[in-house]
Amino acid sequence: MKLYYSPGACSLSPHIVAHELGIRLSIEKTDTKTKRTESGRDFWQINPKGYVPALELDNGEVLTEGPAIVQYLADQKGNTQLAPANGTLARARLQEMLNYITSEIHKTYSPLFKDDTPEATREERKAYLTRRYEYIERILAKQQWLLGDHFTVADAYLFTVTRWAAAVKLDLSGYPALLAFQERVAMRPAVQAAMLAEGLIKQKVAA
């Protein structure tokens, strides 16, 4: 399988999950502005939506959308720690959290990365984000991971998008549980391996 990614983008989430599962993916960097892959392919031909991540399966099919990809990867290995079994309430809870991160956090960052976004809109979006992080903070103040006592694909996704806060000057200092969570996730060997492969860190940090 091949993962099309952009360093530090939301594609980092499935990259982390693959490392957590021990799945050996080939990876290909994609320029999200020119829509060209590192090998020169037209990314529009791979994913007509035009954005990462895209997972090219061994049979040539392409799966898109991060939450779908991370669940697919976990299911391939039957890993019910990273993603509970289909049809269970626990799986529905996972999907509930993935949807929250997608719609309420991930997408809210989008206008903050655009140069032409008016300042008033930036401030409104930042205020919206901090309100959404208040919910996450309450969860993480009571437990180590989003869904309880073990790391799931939702944690990989939250970590990935929350890394963007510094780039858009979003102050998260009022969320100590969230910041502690980010540090915990960053120290996981699979996370460091994915970040190293994407050039986000220069070497793994010793535990």
Label the model's feature ranges.
Residues 1-124, 137:
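GST-like domain detector, emphasizing the conserved glutathione-binding G-site
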Residues 32-33, 151, 180, 200:
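Positions that flank functional sites
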Residues 38-41, 186, 205-206:
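Short secondary-structure transition/capping segments
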Residues 60, 161, 199:
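Flexible loop residues that form catalytic
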Residues 73, 97-190, 194:
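GST-like fold's C-terminal all-alpha helical module
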Residues 196-207:
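Terminal-tail/helix-coil boundary detector
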